[in-house]
């Protein structure tokens, strides 16, 4: 974990998906551990249940400049959830990028992105393209 922790502390871009969101969170609702603690949020592990609770959705994803000001919207982005977490509480330093079924499922804090869904298993690369420019 140390090379990743050094990368985060250096202010370099980081993108955590699913378990990556858990690792980046400052607080976990149902886990006493804190891993990197870089994202001002409380995350609930396995919030969507077991493998059979996996699902897909399509939502708009807001994007932000590193200073937190709005950058734009990625419209109609496919979301694939596999036993994913969700954000139980967003801290003042993080920005909500996306909600699905009434739950926050993507956050941005400066150059840190975290999603409860798996953008890497869809052919849509727009969120990765955004990550490359923050």
Where are the model-predicted features located?
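Amide-donor transfer/coupling interface in amidating biosynthetic enzymes
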Residues: 45-134
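Cysteine-nucleophile active-site neighborhood
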Residues: 1-62
């Amino acid at each position: 974990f140390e090379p990743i922790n050094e990368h985060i502390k250096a202010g370099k871009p980081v993108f955590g998906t699913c378990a990556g969101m858990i690792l980046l969170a400052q607080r976990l609702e149902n886990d006493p551990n804190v891993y990197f603690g870089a994202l001002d949020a409380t995350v609930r592990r396995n919030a969507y249940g077991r493998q059979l609770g996996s699902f897909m959705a399509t939502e708009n994803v807001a994007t932000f400049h590193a200073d937190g000001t709005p950058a734009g919207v990625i419209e109609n982005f496919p979301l694939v959830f596999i036993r994913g977490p969700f954000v139980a509480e967003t801290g003042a330093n993080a920005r909500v990028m996306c909600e699905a079924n009434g739950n926050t499922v993507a956050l941005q804090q400066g150059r840190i992105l975290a999603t409860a869904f798996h953008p890497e298993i869809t052919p849509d690369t727009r969120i990765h393209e955004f990550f490359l420019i923050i």
